[in-house]
Amino acid sequence: MSFELELKRIRDEIVQNLPPEITVTKIEFEGPEIAVYSESEDVAAIETSSTLKDLAKVMRKRVVFRWNVDKRKDPAETKDYIMNLISKDAEIGEITFDHTRGEVIIESGKPGLVIGKKGINLKEIRTNTFWQPKTIRTPPLPSRTIQLIRGMLKKERQTQKDILLEIGKRIHRPALFNNLNIRMNALGGFREVGRSCILMQTRDSNVLLDVGLNVGNPNDRFPYFFVPQFSIRDLDAVIISHSHLDHCGVVPFLYKYGYRGPIYCTLPTRNLSTMLQLDFIQICDKEGTPSPYSKRDVKNAVLHTIPLSWGKVTDIAPDIKLTLHNSGHILGSSMIHLHFGKGDYNFVYTGDFKYQKTRLLEKATVKFPRVEGLLIEATYGGPQDRIPSRQESEKELKQILNSTLKRGGKVLIPVLAVGRAQELLIVLEEYISSGFIDKVPVYIDGLISEATAIHTANPDFLSSDLREKILHQGKNPFLSDFFETVSSQDERADIIGGGPCIILATSGMLIGGPSVHYLKALAEDSKNTLIFVSYQVSGTLGSRIIRGFREFNYIDWKGRTQLVKIGLKVFTLEGFSGHSSRSQISQFLRRIQPRPKVVIVNHGEESKCVSLSTMIHKKLRKSTKSPKNLEVVLLK
């Protein structure tokens, strides 16, 4: 069956299932959505919930209604109508119009007031203007990344519409084969931590799960793209579990070499990935090393990204449906559920996950519609990986901070910009405001402030407790006056020469960035303290210090090398990790519903992957595999 015949079949099915008073003028595949255009003014009939639900149930596809251009109200009149309808308490900012898709985009500090109780305001806007309203949140902290992305999408709306139409054609093409064979190709991140990349293949489709960098080994950065089964031309989709560079850092590289398909991830993951990819280009420029991609490639990736909410079933290929679920690792991080064929096989990729609620995030999901195969991480999957509880680690952190500050020292905490940084900001705000530690400056350096601004724009992805504080109690710990952002070398010099303080700086593994600069300045003074709170990839300076190395070579901006002795105190607080411990992995596997038939282990040092795989097989009586990079696993 050709694409045109498939389009006609779907159109006929939609018309048959709509009320007779609704006139359909055009149907388009906009990416995974079917856009139905109408000239009917009887919006109430279209808005009837049973009609939409019944249609989606029959079609098994996402359907959105739009009105013809000549039916839409004048933009100026529509804007006036919205401003008169919505309370001033909603803090409406810019109102813009996407003429290519018939949407009015309303930016607001309080989107809930724009939406109204049970969506009443959105319904009023649709009924009276024939525009589809869409709300976006104004970040309480200004974000350069969000501003850049929103400006780009506003400028390139026709380009994005054209991209969606092309993606839609590929998604909704007829499947050629009835017999479903599924292969999982290990292209990176197997028996190692870094460059996560999994190629899922059927006879009809090719989908990549994560495309990451090897951050600990700049000489071997990329996944194994050279294998014969991988072809950029044949890729149907790329799905990103979360925004850390070892999972998303190579995405723009695909567009540099011809990929023109979609990226699926959550909205926070898109924004944070863009921030980190642009920063990676900057770091390469500063270090004088060639970047594997350009800002243009990052822009291309943004234009091809289709953000998804958790729990929303989405067609991504003729024989694959995707659903994202919370993984509890960092903001917007997701477990990836793939539904193959007509229920023939269901596969879950956990990505990095945390099966424990934290101050920042809810714990990972354990309930899925169906699961036959599970791919799970083993970062802390070794028998020796007994991570202390979060409460124990917070208590120890408090003691370390107090002892360091009382002896007049400074505390350096290297952190990844996304995840542990925000968790620590919440803890430190409570410690200082409650008087648990002395009121000293808390300096934030590197990308932390920008990443935190993106967190403030996405409260719906935060833990229920934190969301309640921010949205309903007006208490946002990220806006605390205790935190001071550092933005220049002069400010860093003042901090180093100043009194007791706490410094949060990137990078978390001491592979570059201001954290290395601070370490060089503070390292030899025994009054100071260095605290690690996140996983240190093998080969990084952070990993070497944890293993007992007490000196390192520091290269200054002129390229001169200096040997630095480490005399400060060093602590590791693994309880703040965003990864699950071995016991938490076991709990997850005992509680996941339904139980998978086969469990595959990745994302861990070789010994940990093998050990975890063996434990799961023996104790949980599951068929397990711990493949190496380049191995292929036949799932069905």
UniProtKB/Swiss-Prot annotation:
Residues 181-383 are annotated as: Metallo-beta-lactamase N-terminus. Residues 73-140 are annotated as: KHb. Residues 384-577 are annotated as: Beta-Casp. One of its GO terms (molecular function) is exonuclease activity. The keyword Ion transport does not apply. Its EC number is 3.1.-.-. It comes from the Archaea. Zn(2+) 2 binds at residues 246-247, 352, 603. Disulfide bonds: none annotated. It is an enzyme of class 3 (hydrolase). Keywords: DNA-binding, Endonuclease, Exonuclease, Hydrolase, Metal-binding, Nuclease, RNA-binding, Transcription, Transcription regulation, Transcription termination, Zinc. Transmembrane segments: none annotated. Its cofactor is Zn(2+). Gene3D superfamilies: 3.30.300.20, 3.30.300.230, 3.40.50.10890, Ribonuclease Z/Hydroxyacylglutathione hydrolase-like (3.60.15.10). Residues 578-636 are annotated as: Metallo-beta-lactamase C-terminus. InterPro entries: aCPSF1 (IPR019975), Beta_Casp (IPR022712), KH_dom (IPR004087), KH_dom-like_a/b (IPR015946), KH_dom_type_2 (IPR004044), MBL (IPR050698), Metallo-B-lactamas (IPR001279), RibonucZ/Hydroxyglut_hydro (IPR036866). Residues 4-72 are annotated as: KHa. Terminates transcription on the whole genome. Termination is linked to FttA-mediated RNA cleavage and does not require NTP hydrolysis. Cleaves endonucleolytically at the RNA exit channel of RNA polymerase (RNAP); the 5'-3' exonuclease activity of this protein degrades the nascent RNA released from RNAP. Terminates transcription genome-wide in M.maripaludis. Restores wild-type growth to a strain of Methanococcus maripaludis depleted for this gene at 22 degrees Celsius and prevents transcriptional read-through. Transcription termination is most effective in vivo on RNAs with more than one U4-tract in their 3'-ends. Has endonuclease activity after U-rich tracts in transcription termination sequences. Belongs to the metallo-beta-lactamase superfamily. RNA-metabolizing metallo-beta-lactamase-like family. FttA subfamily. HAMAP family: FttA (MF_00870). Homodimer. Interacts with RNA polymerase (RNAP), interacts with the Spt4-Spt5 complex. This is Transcription termination factor FttA.
